[in-house]
């Protein structure tokens, strides 16, 4: 069997991404981690988010995952670099911020978009940085 794609979130919200992957990539196997022990991530410091996300990334890479999806806005906004460091250069790491911004800009090119997010996501400023690229 081929190596799985690892997905993690602070709870079960990332299951929507897992469902989309199953629909689009039906032959791929998935390894899902919902970190309910530390949820919610939205009220955690960037340092704590880096710690949690790095630990999960280590678990997923040790399980042989060929790619990682950080399906949590708070973790994607604050800990994507830490996850990439743990995963190493051979394991692609995908967060949710850039795909969301790309979708929003392609579907609403002239619109004003608002973000409703956790404190950790909003305070990271990542959506502002990505939309001004």
Q: Could you say what each language-model-derived stretch is?
A:
Residues 1-133:
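Non-catalytic structural scaffold of enzyme domains
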């Amino acid at each position: 069997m081929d190596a799985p794609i690892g997905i993690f979130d602070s709870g079960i919200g990332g299951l929507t991404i897992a469902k989309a992957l199953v629909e689009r990539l039906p032959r791929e196997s998935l390894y899902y981690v919902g970190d309910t022990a530390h949820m919610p991530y939205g009220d955690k410091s960037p340092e704590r988010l880096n710690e949690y996300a790095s630990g999960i990334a280590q678990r997923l890479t040790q399980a042989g995952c060929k790619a990682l999806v950080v399906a949590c806005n708070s973790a994607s906004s604050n800990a994507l670099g830490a996850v990439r460091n743990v995963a190493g250069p051979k394991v692609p790491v995908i967060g949710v911020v850039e795909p969301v911004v790309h979708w929003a800009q392609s579907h609403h090119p002239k619109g004003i978009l608002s973000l409703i997010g956790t404190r950790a996501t909003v305070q990271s400023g990542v959506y502002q940085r990505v939309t001004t690229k």
